[in-house]
């Protein structure tokens, strides 16, 4: 394992009056994921993200889900972004850019990532009905209107540029999951060590 790979781990603890979060992340893992947020569909999405990014990821979140899942989902995305930024360190030797198209049945989603140090998020293409759709396989439902906020929180706190778009789709579950998986695959490419690059992949010399 190279020096670039050896240090690419992070542990983030984030505590507020609304949530208590511990995240452990290894960018050079094999997709071992263990997620408990109290929001079962969000667990499913973060498990997909970690698995398809080939990250080792442990998430433990206790939040005020008796009010609503929003705080738990948002705060976990903030902490995950912070963990990603911490694990990347000075970003030496990474590919920096990544993108992926992910189909899921009738849905097609695309994500593009630049590990630029300049946080930005563009999210587009979700059908209007996702503004009021609920995925409710448990007592703590996931409202798909939160999708954009998850990606924004991840990008802002990881300090990456993230573009996520839905080209087409119908089922809220498929649309949401395809986006998480597209982000995962794009991140996997972007943070991967580049054997031809030993320095920071920027003409500025810093990211």
Swiss-Prot record:
<dbReference type="InterPro" id="IPR038494">
    <property type="entry name" value="IGPD_sf"/>
</dbReference>
<protein>
    <recommendedName>
        <fullName>Imidazoleglycerol-phosphate dehydratase</fullName>
        <ecNumber>4.2.1.19</ecNumber>
    </recommendedName>
</protein>
<keyword id="KW-0028">Amino-acid biosynthesis</keyword>
<dbReference type="GO" id="GO:0004424">
    <property type="term" value="F:imidazoleglycerol-phosphate dehydratase activity"/>
</dbReference>
<comment type="similarity">
    <text>Belongs to the imidazoleglycerol-phosphate dehydratase family.</text>
</comment>
<comment type="pathway">
    <text>Amino-acid biosynthesis; L-histidine biosynthesis; L-histidine from 5-phospho-alpha-D-ribose 1-diphosphate: step 6/9.</text>
</comment>
<dbReference type="InterPro" id="IPR000807">
    <property type="entry name" value="ImidazoleglycerolP_deHydtase"/>
</dbReference>
<dbReference type="GO" id="GO:0000105">
    <property type="term" value="P:L-histidine biosynthetic process"/>
</dbReference>
<dbReference type="InterPro" id="IPR020568">
    <property type="entry name" value="Ribosomal_Su5_D2-typ_SF"/>
</dbReference>
<dbReference type="GO" id="GO:0005737">
    <property type="term" value="C:cytoplasm"/>
</dbReference>
<dbReference type="InterPro" id="IPR020565">
    <property type="entry name" value="ImidazoleglycerP_deHydtase_CS"/>
</dbReference>
<keyword id="KW-0368">Histidine biosynthesis</keyword>
<keyword id="KW-0963">Cytoplasm</keyword>
<dbReference type="Pfam" id="PF00475">
    <property type="entry name" value="IGPD"/>
</dbReference>
<keyword id="KW-0456">Lyase</keyword>
